[in-house]
């Protein structure tokens, strides 16, 4: 088809200007093209199996690449490296990625489709309610679905997850008898750790029915019912005062239109001398304006309603709501390592996952998702941060 030939011309011409890594492409007709510096450490081989690949990239960007992987339109020696190469050459990729897309339409969709309370529940259910059995097969025994922080490269994932919890606790500095809120408690890993190691009262909220049921039973099993209260509640319905507030990678589910509500809720539920500890994934400030008006693979297939704020955007809402940023730490490399471990276990446990009713398309979708995130952190296009807040 003519449109495929035109797409090839656009993509291959743009790839001539890549500055990082080396990419070798074998076309459907057997012709081999080489781009970049062959002396680079990051070397990627890609074999095109369907002539529509480049058209899909031009039409839909990361969504097109992910869908093409799911349909076996290409094979590569290393999917994560391929995505990392595109991420490190993002300005080159932007010359063709999604240029047939309609930014205005995406902008309108983002404005119309908001994370209301009901829609937030639907969005969470689509991902987290895939099933506790599914997630328990490939997460560590803390059942923690957020980045670990490793003290050493050899540290086990379980220990690194508890290390992450401790670092966040160190940011909020709780003392005996304090009343603490966790916004977005997942399966209760942080609640168990905090309740076991500190003499505090803890309210934990989630809007996932499956997570609520699991976390409630977990806390009961640990004998922590007197200290920890798990609730199904939207953060916008909170009306209390807490000495400390913690939130681990929940802000990504808030949505662009509700970041103000999120920080306003924190402000209104924090005691005057209280502290806040947040772990968040952020997108680089230089990429934010393009990102906020376009849907990517993760928003399309993994986290509907998901949105990564930039550090600048976070600072704006922190200031607007009368809060002050204190300590701040970056852990991007720790997330890429966490994702590598998750992907390896996911693939190792695939036969068991498959028995739960998931098909090969689902497997490839998750392989792409985990590799996509890993590459984002390696390239520093996205970051993992822990930071503390207090009232001004």
Task: Enumerate the predicted regions with their spans.
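A short acidic, Gly/Pro-enriched loop at the edge of an enzyme's catalytic core
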Residues: 236-245
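Feature captures hydrophobic
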Residues: 1-162, 167
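Substrate-binding/catalytic lobe of Class I Rossmann-like enzymes that use SAM or dcSAM, i.e.
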Residues: 282-392
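Conserved SAM-binding loop
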Residues: 215-216
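A short glycine-rich, Lys/Arg-flanked "PGG" loop and its adjoining helix->strand segment in the class I
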Residues: 260-272
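Conserved beta-strand signature within the Rossmann-like core of class I S-adenosyl-L-methionine
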Residues: 273-281
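Conserved SAM-binding loop of SAM-dependent methyltransferases across substrates and taxa
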Residues: 187-199
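Conserved class I S-adenosyl-L-methionine
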Residues: 176-184
